[in-house]
Amino acid sequence: MSKKPVMLMILDGFGISPNKEGNAVAAANKPNYDRLFAKYPHTELQASGLEVGLPEGQMGNSEVGHLNIGAGRIIYQELTRITKEIKEGTFFTNKALVKAMDEAKENNTSLHLMGLLSNGGVHSHIDHLKGLLELAKKKGLQKVYVHAFMDGRDVAPSSGKEFIVELENAMKEIGVGEIATISGRYYAMDRDNRWERVELAYNAMVLGEGEKASSAVEAIEKSYHDNKTDEFVLPTVIEEDGHPVARIKDGDSVIFFNFRPDRAREITRAIVDPEFKGFERKQLHVNFVCMTQYDKTLECVDVAYRPESYTNTLGEYVASKGLNQLRIAETEKYAHVTFFFNGGVEQPNTNEDRALIASPKVATYDLKPEMSAYEVTDELINRLDQDKYDMIILNFANPDMVGHTGVQEAAVKAIEAVDECLGKVADKVLEKEGTLFITADHGNAEVMIDYSTGKPMTAHTSDPVPFLWVSKDAEGKSLKDGGKLADIAPTMLTVMGLEVPSEMTGTCLLNK
């Protein structure tokens, strides 16, 4: 007998904006989406700010979006949690942070603070770095060095100089800290095993090798002069009298202040992992603190903010009912439909199958806007024909990953490719008498230009996202307004005929 699968399709970075200018979502020819939108119930969901556990007005992101969707409740993010602790003062007694600083003081070694320098709030926040500098000052440390990763992706592409100036002013005011290196996140924060990039960032921080400059401002200005925006700044060593300001050495303390794990793992492994094989390097012995848990299998690090655990996430609850589920995405978003969707748990649930389709190896995704969407779709159709799954979670990475390039024509092509795939998937699910919910985790591709400057916009947005209910049972029915991402899981469970567990505080969006 054919199963009637309930599927959630997440169009990553597909937001809704009334403004048509620079809007790749509106500009794209998407007959399949339009057809489903016209025929089936739909509403808009909030995917940013307090509705997803972020600070008010903070744009959403993929990690946060998938956590909220999978948990069926608002998940207070590390960003909100750490900022709150700095305000309340408990940050300054955090055991792991205090221990790393005390050891640097006792052993007369250096403290290195590394991470993404911006207020983007996706991977890090400059205020957390300022908090660490204040703590270092309180502890009486003098040898404190910052290894700044330049952003240009979650914030404007050439805003890095402003953040460097802001940091230098803060260090002056607090009375401690010097910038030792700067590197574009393209190098320091790779997540796709492109070790030749990571090696350049590592060499700057540890060996003092790479581009040279007499100040961080000089380094970033040179980069702009060479037409390299923040994300692509070549790893640069800041020198004084012909010598590096500082290098990470044996016995030093290192605090990595990024709170989002996925782009923090590779450079961390390069520094601390005794089994590291990415490139040739000598083993360092440092006191290393990760702001959050980047990887459970890394035992040689301390963690400042351990993950909170969540019971009865959507995947766990469906598994407890003896049902089969599938998670499917290409490499760029695979962690999102598995690890993040499961509330930060790496281990699959019972009867949870996973299909990983490799993302194309291109320098930037505007060069291949369709990415691996067609391959993901082919694999999904094959799996649907097996009649095995009760629930399927699917992610199309294109609107987000191509949206990040700032190239509008490419983002339009990305959405058109996804629409083609969406049509095939919807037809197959309807053929199986199943239900397809279509949504997004946050906005991006609907705003491809910065309206204040007219320049390309590469960051996420705070726009709402669509929520469509595609099913024979849905015709003529309606969905509630005023929803948020946390309402999706209770809605799916209701359609599956399952009771919503008490831990899920989201609301079912079906109008009775």
Swiss-Prot record:
Protein name (Swiss-Prot/TrEMBL): 2,3-bisphosphoglycerate-independent phosphoglycerate mutase
Q: Per UniProt, where does substrate bind? A: H123, R153, D154, R185, R191, R260, P261, D262, R263, K333
Q: Which PANTHER family match?
A: 2,3-BISPHOSPHOGLYCERATE-INDEPENDENT PHOSPHOGLYCERATE MUTASE (PTHR31637:SF0)
Detail which positions bind Mn(2+) 1: D400, H404, H460
Q: Mind telling me which GO cellular component terms the entry cites?
A: cytosol
The GO biological-process annotations, alphabetized, read as:
glucose catabolic process; glycolytic process
Q: Which UniProt keywords apply?
A: Glycolysis, Isomerase, Manganese, Metal-binding
- Names of required cofactors: Mn(2+)
Q: What is its EC number?
A: 5.4.2.12
Q: In which pathway does it act?
A: Carbohydrate degradation; glycolysis; pyruvate from D-glyceraldehyde 3-phosphate: step 3/5
Co-factor remark:
Binds 2 manganese ions per subunit.
Q: Does the keyword Aminoacyl-tRNA synthetase apply?
A: no
User: Active site at which residues?
Assistant: S62 (phosphoserine intermediate)
Species name for this entry? Clostridium perfringens (strain ATCC 13124 / DSM 756 / JCM 1290 / NCIMB 6125 / NCTC 8237 / Type A)
